[in-house]
């Protein structure tokens, strides 16, 4: 067995976050091979290397900012490595600054924002360079993961940020009565955040995704011993249930388990003599 040095043990600990004794044992078990030691620890469920990679993508904040007239809104995800930094004033202040900059400059994508110059407080650097400077300031890598902008010229925007700023949703609703529709739009934003739909309506769900689900359900039915002549009917039943899970208008309404979102919209329109149509939504969850 090769001699295991304290330096090697420390290097493995720095890489994985695992305790010194476990690192020493891993190196002994793998003949001092660093890579094999990491794999050994992962297999034992003790390694933190994979978790650290996830933390880079999952810690940070979702930030949403809307114009005063609620016609334009931006949602972005800014990542860091630890929750400690994510909750700090330096990080949250920077995230809010980026959202304000994106809204003011009509940025519709991450790339748009990266090319914009920040103010004097951040050295008049472009956002892309400021991210690197901020990394040095907070001691962790910062990354602008994604950004989207929604507009509702003929309606209203609403948003929802879950406590902790790890989950947020922005929704655009077309309506001829925007003031009356604001509360409903807020509920719909909460619906998007909580229920995680992928599209507004059934027709927008990608055909290839539907076909993939159908094939999975078909194979499941056959594996359950269902007769071939009944399989198609079973598949369609399960596809309809799938739509109820991923299509916003077909989901169960979070504030009334006996109602569908489509029914809530219909009731609102009748009661308020209004036209309401969900135009688009964006949902960001840290690391997702």
From Swiss-Prot:
Biological function: Associates with the EF-Tu.GDP complex and induces the exchange of GDP to GTP. It remains bound to the aminoacyl-tRNA.EF-Tu.GTP complex up to the GTP hydrolysis stage on the ribosome.
Keyword field contains NAD: no
Alphabetized GO MF terms: translation elongation factor activity
PROSITE patterns: EF_TS_1 (PS01126), EF_TS_2 (PS01127)
Disulfide bridge partners, by residue number: none
Species: Chlorobaculum parvum (strain DSM 263 / NCIMB 8327)
Family, per entry: Belongs to the EF-Ts family.
Protein name listed in UniProt: Elongation factor Ts
Subcellular localization, as worded in the UniProt entry: Cytoplasm
Entry keyword set: Cytoplasm, Elongation factor, Protein biosynthesis
InterPro entries given in the database record: EF-Ts_dimer_sf, Transl_elong_EFTs/EF1B, Transl_elong_EFTs/EF1B_dimer, Transl_elong_Ts_CS, UBA-like_sf
Recorded superkingdom: Bacteria
Cited CDD domains: UBA_EF-Ts
Cellular component, GO, one term: cytoplasm
Main location: cytoplasm
Chain intervals for the UniProt region annotation (Involved in Mg(2+) ion dislocation from EF-Tu): 82-85
